[in-house]
Amino acid sequence: MPWWSKSKDEKKKTNKESIIDAFNRKLGFASEDRSSGRSRKSRRRRDEIVSERGAISRLPSRSPSPSTRVSRCQSFAERSPAVPLPRPIVRPHVTSTDSGMNGSQRPGLDANLKPSWLPLPKPHGATSIPDNTGAEPDFATASVSSGSSVGDIPSDSLLSPLASDCENGNRTPVNISSRDQSMHSNKNSAEMFKPVPNKNRILSASPRRRPLGTHVKNLQIPQRDLVLCSAPDSLLSSPSRSPMRSFIPDQVSNHGLLISKPYSDVSLLGSGQCSSPGSGYNSGNNSIGGDMATQLFWPQSRCSPECSPVPSPRMTSPGPSSRIQSGAVTPLHPRAGGSTTGSPTRRLDDNRQQSHRLPLPPLLISNTCPFSPTYSAATSPSVPRSPARAEATVSPGSRWKKGRLLGMGSFGHVYLGFNSESGEMCAMKEVTLCSDDPKSRESAQQLGQEISVLSRLRHQNIVQYYGSETVDDKLYIYLEYVSGGSIYKLLQEYGQFGENAIRNYTQQILSGLAYLHAKNTVHRDIKGANILVDPHGRVKVADFGMAKHITAQSGPLSFKGSPYWMAPEVIKNSNGSNLAVDIWSLGCTVLEMATTKPPWSQYEGVPAMFKIGNSKELPDIPDHLSEEGKDFVRKCLQRNPANRPTAAQLLDHAFVRNVMPMERPIVSGEPAEAMNVASSTMRSLDIGHARSLPCLDSEDATNYQQKGLKHGSGFSISQSPRNMSCPISPVGSPIFHSHSPHISGRRSPSPISSPHALSGSSTPLTGCGGAIPFHHQRQTTVNFLHEGIGSSRSPGSGGNFYTNSFFQEPSRQQDRSRSSPRTPPHVFWDNNGSIQPGYNWNKDNQPVLSDHVSQQLLSEHLKLKSLDLRPGFSTPGSTNRGP
C-alpha cells in the first residue's frame, strides 16, 4: 500500500496551509512562495526521473494541482544559501541538474562503483553535487518528516526517527527532496508512495525487506563497510544520546541509487531499542550492523526521544566495568570505512565534541568500599579474614589486635586476639551494635548477659573472662583462648571418643557445672560445640550467652537452647527445677561423645521436639559404653527434673569417680620443688636433636599409685603426688590403648604430655648436641628398671640404693659399664638447664636427682613388667635378661 491513497481535492485543500505553516515554522522558510508550482511536464516524465540523491517527497501529492508541486520543487532550487539553518542537522541547499541518465547506464554503476564516504553539508552552504550517473531511472524520491506530525493525516505517524538537536534539544524536521525538475515519472502518485509495514520498527533479520516500496530492488549492503557500533566494547548499548551523525557508505551494490547527500533518516546502526539507558542488552544487529537493509532506510520507525536516529560513532561504551573507570563518554568520530579529510562532517563532529560532551546516565553503583560502615569485613560471614591479615588495634586504648576468624555463632563472631606488647592471645567475641536491627539488639543483650555471668566466675573448667569494651558501633568481649577447639569439632575430625576420654571430659564438665550451680547459675546450652578442650586435655565450658542467674522469684525458663540437647521441661515450658536442665544436656552430650551425634538426631525440627517433650522412652544408648556409663546416662535423662541428681552428686558416680583430674601435681615442701625442677627439665629436652624417654602406660602407673610402693626404704604413695595420670587426648592417646601393639617407644607420642611421663619417639638420633641420644636414654631406663625390679643383682643397701645407686661416682660407674651393657652413663646438668650424658657428676646436684628423680622412675615402673622392650632399640643382651 502507498503511504496514502488518492486523496480528494477537498482534503488536500484543507491540509495545504497547515503543512506549509509547519514547514515554515520548523525549517525557517521565509515565505509561502517557496511552494511555487512546478511544471506539468514533470508529471508526464515521472518514469524517466533519476534523482542524484534525496528521498521520496510526499508533499507534491498533497498539492491540489501539478503546478503547485512544480513550483515547490523550483522554490527549493531557488533558495538562497545564506539563510541560517538549525543545528546540528543543517538544511542543505538543494539544486537540480539534468543528469541525462537513462536505463542504459545502470551496468556501469554495478561494475565500477567504488566505495567512498559522502560528506555532510557545510553549516551555511550547499553541498556540491557532482553529475553522477548510473542511478536507477525508476527510483522516485520521497520526503522525510520528523516525528512531530506536519499534517493531520494518519500517515504522519509513520515517519522517520526524530532528529535530536544536540545543542538546543529541539526537534528539527528534515525534508530532503532532491528532485530532477526536468525528468519526472508519469506514474500515479498512489502507485509511487507505499507505506512501509510497522514491523520495520523491530529489527528484521532479512536484508530483502524494502522499506520504501517495491522500487528499491535487490538492496544489498556490504558488511565490511558497515561495521559501525554504538557500543563495540560492550553488550550494553550506549546509555547516552548520541550526536546526530550520518554514515552512508558509497558502495551499495545493485541498488541503482548513488547517493550524494546524507539522509537524516538513515540509521545504519542501532535497533529499534536504540541506545536508551533502559534498553538493557540489545540485539546483535545493534553491535555489528547485521540487518543493514532495514537500518539503511527506516522511513517509518519511530524511536524514543532518548534514542539517536543516526548511527552513533564508535566509542568506548560505558558498560558494567567502564562506567566506573571512565569519565564522560565522548565520541571519537572515526569512520568505519575511512574518512574524508577536512570534510564538513569532521568539522561538525569537532564542534559538537567541544560543545556537548555526552554525560553518563545516573547509575546505581554500590559504594567503593565493599562493606557498608555498619557491616564491615569483620562481621561478614562470606568474607572471612585471612590469618595473615591482622587489623590495626581495635581502638587506641585497646591492647588487643583482631586476627583471623575463629568461628561464628548465633550472636556474633569470634576472632583471635593478640597483644603485641605482652604476647598474650585471647578470643575476641564481636557484636555489631545497631539500634534499629532486632537481631543486633538481641545479640548485644546476649553478650551483655554473658559478661555479667562470666565476670563473677573463676574456675579451671570455665573459660576465663578478661574484659570487654565498646569500639565505635561494635561491642567486644575478651575471653580465654582455648586452641584445641570444641568437642564437636574433635568429633567431626576424629570420630567418636573412647570411654576413658568420655569419663575424663564428663568429670571436668561436671566439675564446672557443680561450681556454676553452686552460684545459682544455669548454663542452658551445654553441648559439644560449647565445650572447649585445650592441648593438654583440659576442658573449658564456654558460651554463656544463654546463662541465667536463678533467683527465688524465677519462673519457668524461657525457650532457649539447642533442641537436641534441650530438657523436656524447657520444651513444654513447665515449672520445675531450673538447674536440672544442665544435667539433662550433660547426658545428651555424653551420648554425643559416644556416637558423634546427639540423641534423637534422626528427627528434625518439630518432630524432634515432640519426641523429646512427650516421648516416654529413652534415646538409644550405644552398646560399647560400659554399664557404668549407661547408668550415668540414664540418671541424667530422667524426665522428671526432680529425679535427676545434682552435679555434685554425679561427681561421686562410679563413671567419673575414679578418673584422675588433669591438674598438674602440686605438693608442698622441698621434695615437691625438686620434683617440679626435674619434671620441667625433662620436658625442656631439645626435641630437634633427640626425643624424650618412652611414655609410660598410665593405667599401670595408676594401679601402682592405688596400691602403693611396697619395697624399698618406705617409699609409698603418700610420698608421691596422687595425680600422676597423663592428660587425656580424645583420639590416639597412649593411655587408651595400653594393650595395643603400638606401645612404648614404638607408639607415636601423644600431643598431650604428662609432667611425669615423658613421651617418646621411635626415631633414634645420634650425637649429644645438648640432649641425650635416644639409645642412651632407653638404655638408661631399661637397665635401671632391670636393676631395681627383681634383677639378678640386688641393690646394695635398700634405701641407699634409691638415693645413690642410680647416680654413682665415675670410677664405679665405669667399672659397671664394662661388666654389663645395662649400665647407664652418668647424667649431669649443663649450663643450659638440660640433661646431658657423661661421666662427670657434680655431687652438689646429687640429692635432687637421686632423692626424687630416681624414686619417681622406680615408683612408676615397679608394675610395668609388660613394658615393650623392643630389641631393635636396645643394646644386645639387655632385652634377653629377665626382670
Curated annotation (Swiss-Prot):
One Gene Ontology MF term: protein serine kinase activity
Biased composition (Low complexity): 57-72, 143-165, 733-756
Gene Ontology terms: biological process: inflorescence development; stomatal complex morphogenesis; suspensor development
Expression (tissue specificity): Expressed in roots, leaves, guard cells, stems, flowers and siliques.
GO cellular component terms, A-Z: cell cortex; plasma membrane
Active site residues per record: D525 (proton acceptor)
Lineage top rank: taxon: Eukaryota
Reactions listed under catalytic activity: L-seryl-[protein] + ATP = O-phospho-L-seryl-[protein] + ADP + H(+); L-threonyl-[protein] + ATP = O-phospho-L-threonyl-[protein] + ADP + H(+)
Keywords: ATP-binding, Cell membrane, Cytoplasm, Developmental protein, Growth regulation, Kinase, Membrane, Nucleotide-binding, Transferase
Phenotype caused by lack of the gene: Severely dwarf plants that rarely survive on soil, small rosettes, compact leaves, extremely compressed shoots, and short, sterile flowers. No proper elongation of the zygote and differentiation of the extra-embryonic suspensor. Excess of stomata in leaves.
EC number: 2.7.11.25
Additional free-text comment from the UniProt record: N-terminal deletions of YDA results in gain-of-function alleles with phenotypes (no stomata and exaggerated suspensor growth) opposite to loss-of-function phenotypes.
Protein name: Mitogen-activated protein kinase kinase kinase YODA
Taxonomic lineage of the native organism: Eukaryota, Viridiplantae, Streptophyta, Embryophyta, Tracheophyta
